């Protein structure tokens, strides 16, 4: 029997978080097969990664609208990234990046999604001595993407990246450097807990983002041991998820947490564990409020 919690009273801290699962769990499976598994395992949302068979073509968008309505699953969109680079020194690559992300934004609009996740650019080894130019390119491309998002009423969630050589947007400070000159309410951060763990303490990462005034609008969850982007099941790495969830509640986050594991079995287990952790956090908060009354 599930234990009861002291959460019946209204609380500014007790906020509902929804648990989603990423296309990364399913690719290259079909949309139908993926959605059936999502519904079977009671995920609240599906983060569609616009790659391969899950690219948001007009045909796929129409079909996803039917699946979404049939299974009553919320859709979040992750823009394509594998062959693209918003910071590229090649103008044609930057233009292609914008057009592909435009497809994701338009698809998100059709699917009633609020957020499109976007990766910042990276510095190719050939251009490692041209960081200033790379950053300028990244700014120009992201600015154009945000303008498109504003036209559709979509929010762009710029994702923090793992601590790999040449990657932009690894730390809160580097994210600030990217977004500081883009004045738009349609731009925020997709906080990737696993990526943050390769760059330090994920809970402190949340606090730093809050302190420098960058809002978290979406969250990715997976585990690792701090050295590589392993996408392990929750509990198999060294991340203190209870501490991270506490920080997310402190800043008032009540959106989707998308689970990014390597298979559906791990994703389902991760969801179960995260729900248990969230219950623990809620109980701690309720007890704290009781003491303060």
From Swiss-Prot:
One GO BP annotation of this record: DNA repair
InterPro entries referenced in this protein's UniProt entry, alphabetically: AP_endonuc_2, IolE/XylAMocC-like, Xyl_isomerase-like_sf, Xyl_isomerase-like_TIM-brl
Gene3D superfamilies associated with the record: Divalent-metal-dependent TIM barrel enzymes (3.20.20.150)
SMART domains: AP2Ec
A Pfam family assignment: AP_endonuc_2
Record-level Gene Ontology MF annotations: DNA binding; zinc ion binding
Family: To M.jannaschii MJ1614 and MJ0008.
Protein name: Uncharacterized protein MJ1311
Protein source organism: Methanocaldococcus jannaschii (strain ATCC 43067 / DSM 2661 / JAL-1 / JCM 10045 / NBRC 100440) (Methanococcus jannaschii)
């Amino acid at each position: 029997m599930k234990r009861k919690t002291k959460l019946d009273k209204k609380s500014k801290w007790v906020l509902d978080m929804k648990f989603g699962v990423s296309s990364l769990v399913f690719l290259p499976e079909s949309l139908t097969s993926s959605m059936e598994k999502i519904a079977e395992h009671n995920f609240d949302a599906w983060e569609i990664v616009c790659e391969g068979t899950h690219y948001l073509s007009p045909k796929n968008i129409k079909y996803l609208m039917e699946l979404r309505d049939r299974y009553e699953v919320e859709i979040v969109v992750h823009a394509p990234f594998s062959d693209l680079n918003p910071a590229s020194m090649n103008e044609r690559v930057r233009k292609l990046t914008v057009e592909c992300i435009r497809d994701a934004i338009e698809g998100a609009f059709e699917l009633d999604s609020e957020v499109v996740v976007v990766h910042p650019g990276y510095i190719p080894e050939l251009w490692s001595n041209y960081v200033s130019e790379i950053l300028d390119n990244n700014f120009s491309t992201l600015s154009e993407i945000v303008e498109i998002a504003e036209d559709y009423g979509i929010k762009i969630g710029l994702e923090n990246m793992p601590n790999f050589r040449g990657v932009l947007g690894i730390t809160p400070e580097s994210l600030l450097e990217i977004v500081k000159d883009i004045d738009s309410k349609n731009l925020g951060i997709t906080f990737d807990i696993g990526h943050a763990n390769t760059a330090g303490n994920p809970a402190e990462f949340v606090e730093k983002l809050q302190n420098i005034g960058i809002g978290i609008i979406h969250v990715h969850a997976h585990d690792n041991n701090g050295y590589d982007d392993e996408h392990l099941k929750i509990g198999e790495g060294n991340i203190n998820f209870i501490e991270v969830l506490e920080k997310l509640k402190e800043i008032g986050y009540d959106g989707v947490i998308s689970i990014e594991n390597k298979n559906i079995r791990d994703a389902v287990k991760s969801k179960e564990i995260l729900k248990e952790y969230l219950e623990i956090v809620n109980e701690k908060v309720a007890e704290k409020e009781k003491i303060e009354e």
